[in-house]
């Protein structure tokens, strides 16, 4: 069975900060995002150009052979989710770290453990969130372990890799752009939320569209807002004005490092 490890545990598009559980293991009282966590790559919305049969990730899965990649995209587009499900799809051990919270000691431990698993024929997918936060020397530290196959690296970044990552690291990894989720993809997330809750959101059709528009392509934000709406009882569905009054207005520009 595939082994999963987090050093430390990290958030993703559909989950909080705990290691991923299978849908059957998620409690009915868990946050909405956890209960909507995809179980397969095919369930990830909005990135079909990458995960579909003709996409780079889809082709890797079909071939059963995964190369190191850098996932570049805005927040809330499913970078961590995609990496975790990619490991599942090709049968790799999944380890996730964050460049914000991890240092040299953490990396040494990850690589040492990956070598031990490699000796028994178990390969490791190492997911590095916010990989651009590692300095140049730390980025260089990945090279020998990527080159000898100790780990297959999947890095995630919201920043342009050409400016933030070493040329040597980029030459050993394929950069894949993940798109901001469009209206149909976000609407599909709300459909799933309504299905799992067993009731529609307390919104008029126009307010539902306004909620989708307010997410600005961020699926994580949308699900959090939906959960907020489900936590309150309303006498009647909210119209756009009522929705705007209820929810805090979304900040137009996020901290680029969130």
Predicted region positions:
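Short glycine-rich substrate-engagement loop in P-loop NTPases that contacts/grips substrate
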Residues: 52-54, 93-125
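Conserved catalytic/switch belt of AAA+ P-loop NTPases
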Residues: 62, 132-171
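C-terminal helical "lid" of AAA+/P-loop NTPase domains
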Residues: 209-214, 220-234
